[in-house]
Swiss-Prot record:
It comes from the Bacteria. This is UDP-N-acetylenolpyruvoylglucosamine reductase. Its EC number is 1.3.1.98. Keywords: Cell cycle, Cell division, Cell shape, Cell wall biogenesis/degradation, Cytoplasm, FAD, Flavoprotein, NADP, Oxidoreductase, Peptidoglycan synthesis. The keyword Cytoplasm applies. GO terms for molecular function: FAD binding; UDP-N-acetylmuramate dehydrogenase activity. The keyword Transcription does not apply. Pathway: Cell wall biogenesis; peptidoglycan biosynthesis.
């Protein structure tokens, strides 16, 4: 008898040996021992409190910035969905969003409420949970500029609230990536007042720019590498000759050379292998280290 046969009772869905590829934008990767789709915050807390504490746990959103290796993932992967996708305008230019809310939806809801400053989220793939954890941003704006507080749940199912100061934000990084793993439940953001139509016009400009410069309809994980100090990753990849160059079923997009894409039949090994080959080549040619922005999890196949 294993821990998988002794799972706590849950109101949400428990899926055993479930393929993770359909849960990610790359559409690759092996199975998780267990995928848990909690019904709501209480269901998640009760499950974690009843789960064997030795079992690894991690949470995902829509899998937009995630590469799951072909051998799959040990433990429980928690997919946050309907019970975590509420948005509520709080007044005083503040808005609260659940961790499963798509970034673009938060931008639209903020615009409808006349809250400016969150427009950039319309250009960020993924959900609020991931945005808060990695200080997501684009076109000169970042999460640190607008988030005020975050509620998280730890592995023991205990909830606490953190201020933006507690998060110690830097470029594409927060304190949530260090130390004890936690699950983001929701966050409160603050913008500035403006007319909804003016906000929506700025969002439309971001959307148009993104559609002409990024392969948003491909199987991609968004930006592959962080920008090194003083450099643009896309330019380093491009100048090293990797734009549009096939590597198994993987390629750096001809449209944007910092976007790794699955051209149809890629494995996770193709995608990660290409990324590592490019990192090594760029380092050899320029002396500049490229660091992954995409999160890679699981076992090699």
């Amino acid at each position: 008898m294993t821990w998988k046969t002794q799972l706590p009772t849950a109101r949400g869905k428990l899926l055993i040996d479930e393929a993770l590829a359909p849960f990610t934008w790359f559409r690759v990767g092996g199975p998780a021992d267990v995928v848990f789709l909690p019904a709501d915050e209480q269901d998640l807390s009760d499950f974690l409190k009843g789960l064997d504490p030795s079992v690894p746990v991690m949470a995902i959103g829509v899998g937009s910035n995630l590469l799951v290796r072909d051998g799959g993932v040990d433990g429980v992967v928690i997919r946050l969905g309907k019970g975590f996708n509420g948005v509520e305008a709080l007044g005083d230019n503040r808005i609260k969003a659940g961790s499963a809310v798509p970034d673009a939806i938060l931008a639209r809801k903020a615009a409808e409420a006349g809250i400016a400053g969150l427009e950039f989220y319309v250009g960020v793939p993924g959900t609020i949970g991931g945005a808060v954890i990695m200080n997501a941003g684009c076109y000169g704006a970042e999460t640190v500029n607008v988030v005020k507080s975050v509620r998280v749940m730890n592995r023991a199912g205990v909830v606490r609230e953190l201020s933006v100061e507690d998060l110690h934000y830097t470029y594409r990084h927060s304190a949530l990536q260090d130390g004890e793993p936690v699950i983001v439940l929701d966050a409160i953001f603050e913008g500035t007042p403006d007319e909804p139509e003016a906000i929506k016009a700025r969002m439309a400009e971001i959307t148009a720019r993104r559609e002409t410069t990024q392969p948003i309809r491909e199987k991609t994980g968004g930006s592959t590498f962080k920008n090194p100090p003083g450099h643009s990753s896309w330019k380093l990849v491009d100048e090293a000759g990797w734009r549009g160059k096939p590597y198994g079923g993987a390629m750096f997009s001809p449209l944007h050379s910092n976007f790794l894409i699955n051209t149809g039949e890629a494995t996770a090994a193709d995608l990660e292998g290409l990324g590592e080959a490019v990192r090594a080549d760029v380092l050899a040619k320029t002396g500049v280290q490229l660091d992954w922005e995409i999160k890679r999890i699981g076992r090699a196949g």
